[in-house]
């Protein structure tokens, strides 16, 4: 009977997991929640060379804050779309700023796999950061990230204007934000 209860509980957890996302082993109540309309909390983490990069240094540009990991299949499948959109909009003029940047916060635990994934997926933007703490990343906790990929679209004034945009939805949001 005990095995049936355990299997039933496992099935419920599996059924509640959104398709195409990898979930965190952290209780949701331990995490913050950043919503559309909130000011984006600042993040400061090392890049692969050890230099600290801050999200706030990109103020004045539209930013996609992208939580991902080298081991996350859905994240890696979305990367070609993010690269395409980055190349298309990096110099665009928006109503709240000029230019589009990606701030990639990796939830990897190992630096080598993280750097290898950046190169293999052709992630050409300069803002790759990680504290290499995996799901225990302070950035993930601050933003309430409990599944990846997770994205926050931030306008040039630092306000979150959309969450979890993927595929064509990201490009459509950027088009709508362009200066008229």
Regions found by a protein language model. Give the residues of each.
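N-terminal "domain-start" segment that seeds a small globular fold
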Residues: 22-56, 173-175, 179
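Bacterial Sec-dependent N-terminal signal peptides
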Residues: 1-27, 180
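Thiol-/selenol-based redox modules, centered on thioredoxin-like
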Residues: 148-180
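Conserved helix-turn-beta segment immediately C-terminal to the redox Cys motif
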Residues: 77-104
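Short, internal strand/loop/helix patches
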Residues: 103, 108-110, 115-152, 156
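Alpha/beta-hydrolase fold active-site loops
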Residues: 62-63, 100, 149
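Short active-site neighborhood of thiol/selenol oxidoreductases, capturing the structured segment around
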Residues: 54-76
